[in-house]
Swiss-Prot record:
GO terms for biological process: locomotion; muscle contraction; parturition; potassium ion transmembrane transport. It is found in: Membrane. Gene3D superfamilies: 1.10.287.70. It comes from Caenorhabditis briggsae. This is Uncoordinated protein 58. The lineage of its organism: Eukaryota, Metazoa, Ecdysozoa, Nematoda, Chromadorea. Keywords: Ion channel, Ion transport, Membrane, Transmembrane, Transmembrane helix, Transport. It is a multi-pass membrane protein. Has a role in mobility, possibly in the transport of potassium in muscles. GO terms for molecular function: outward rectifier potassium channel activity; potassium ion leak channel activity.
Amino acid sequence: MFFYSPNVASSSSASHRRGTLTHQHHLHVGHLDTRLSVQIPEILSRNFGHHDPERARLVPEHLRFLVDENQELWTGGNQPPVGILELCAASPVDSVFSTNDARRHSQRKLILRRPTISIQEDGKIIIDHVTARWEGANINSQSALLDADDGATVITDTIKDDQEDKEPKSCPQQTVKYIKILLPHVILVSVLIGYLCLGAWILMLLETRTELLSRSKKLVRLTNLMSNFTAESWRMLSDAQHGSITMDEGEWAATFREWMVRVSETVDDRRPIRRELNRPDDLSNMHNKWTFPTALLYVLTVLTTCGYGEVSVDTDVGKVFSVAFALVGIPLMFITAADIGKFLSETLLKFVSFWNRSVRKVKQWMSRVRHGRRKSLQSTGGQNDTLDILGVDGTEEKLWFPIGAYVSCICLYCSMGSAMFINWERTWSFIHAFHFGFNLIVTVGLGDIVVTDYIFLSLIVAFVIVGLSVVTMCVDLASTHLKAYFTRIHYFGRAKRFLGMSEELKEIVALLGAMRRKKGGKVTWNDVRDFLDNELRDRPFEPHELLMKLRFIDETSSGMSTIRHNSFQSDFFRESEYIRRVAALRPEQPAYL
């Protein structure tokens, strides 16, 4: 609420208003004199016009301050400067009082709000409740709090300005600073690329020989088939030439076809080539990859963002449908997995807490039996139970597991799944089944498995959904550690203050930082509570004219009591002794920050 005077003697309905005092307009006198000098123009303009030179001379010499280097506030019959007293027939609150405009032109300012906040040269923040003008408004806990746009913003701007006022760093120092900030990120990306290259090189060494041997065996079989077919054809031709046998065209075609079918079966051993070649024009005789099990596995891999090499969509309509299906289904899948994972994590937390309490009670019981001090240990045990359940500070304690525990949990689930898969796929080894299950739950891929049994298909779907929930549970429990590690790496070499915070949190952090610097140590909740209770809450209403109507004990006479208010104001501003007495009654406000 800005200070303005509605009662101004003027031809128009104009009102005098006072803007925010900038740092260059401060007086070189005491703190109280500075505040009183701010109220002088308002009181004078309230009771008489600014055109009265006699009244203007009533201002003491040491309370005058300069608008610029050559012009005083009032000199003779001159008009008051626009920078301090502005005539305006518009609303009593104008842009001249905007704290944003004032903040662009000054670093420190005297904010005449309720309560009055001022920042001294040494950085102290003074909150004054006596000289603040309230216009008859009652003070409550809400109105007495700092205005976020004025009080705390000034603190934040002061901190930022102090940081900007530091000496600029040289070019090598700036280079070292940016290198320090970029170094952990470059190292992280380099480690990731190196890890990928290392994995590719190791897999290349492990799988190259096996892949070459498998392909060589296949080519050997094809070579043998071609050699046998050539030998058989030559034998049949020789026998026909020598008259040993007679061969017609149909017999030769059947023999040649048989050898070609064998070659095709060797190249593609996953399709019933022989049956399909018998009736190639009959579509019902063809092998269909898009069965319900394979289609279900495909859409499952679409929602879990892992691949399936057995089938893929080829039509344009199918591709559009797959995209639309994934846009709706992927969030649904992960929300469901997260919900189940949260339930599993809460269940695990309750189980571990119950286990810890049970073990603790057993140990206490064994200790009581062993030492025979039941009563004392029972009382101590009852207190410990409360502390263990709620934590030391009365909050629910967090369950902490090392990172290896979450990895072990995932591996245990994959082992259970591999034991299930082995019962359905007799040709699979434990390692093969474990790898298959792990690829499913970490959304690597389903491979090119062909499922024909519906029970086995149902087990795979359930394994994938529950597996994603288990992974989500592990990530949820390990999020605290992962977030701490990520924060350390991401903000290495730079300050974490104000990053990712809202504007309100920035103001609070700035206020606490100022309190910590003034206190010289850690700011506790008691410090904040004392500051709020002592300065901003439970403050009685004090009229803004309290100091003007105040009488000293040596001035209480029948004559003084009948002096009119206006003449008393003249005496008030004429006598510097009165100002000295007022200053003696109101010592400097303590700096709570």
